[in-house]
Amino acid sequence: MMKKLQEMQQKVEETKVRLDTITVEGTASNGKVTLIMTGNRKVNSISINEKLGGFDREELEDLLIIATNDALEKAESVNELEMKAASAGMIPGM
């Protein structure tokens, strides 16, 4: 049983490493604001299209929040799927 637990822990750790290599993209305003994030929910980059124009600071902040939340939702989905795959066969409640 300990060996099985160690194998499962190893799979989870490998999955965490793999999630650092998976990226998702969140966007706002038809792609004029883009945020790239890893499957582990770490922001890699934020891009603002130079043609965005016409937005004040508060509107731009709102667009950044929208793009961030979009990326977070996608990263959470990827993370959940990867962790489910890694924990397949685990004993429930462990």
Where are these regions (language model features)?
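Alpha-helix boundary/capping detector
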Residues: G31-T34, S45, A67, M90-M94
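A short acidic/small-residue loop/turn micro-motif
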Residues: E50-L52
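Long amphipathic alpha-helical segments used for membrane anchoring, targeting, substrate engagement
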Residues: M1-T21, E25, K74-M94
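N-terminal intrinsically disordered, cationic/polar leader segments
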Residues: T27-I46, F55
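Residue-level signature of catalytic and energy-coupling elements of molecular machines
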Residues: L5, R41, L64
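Stable alpha-helical structural segments in soluble proteins, enriched in small hydrophobic residues
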Residues: L63, A67-A75
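Short terminal (N- or C-terminal) low-complexity/amphipathic segments
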Residues: T34-I36, L60, I65
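Residues at secondary-structure transition points
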Residues: G54-D62, V78
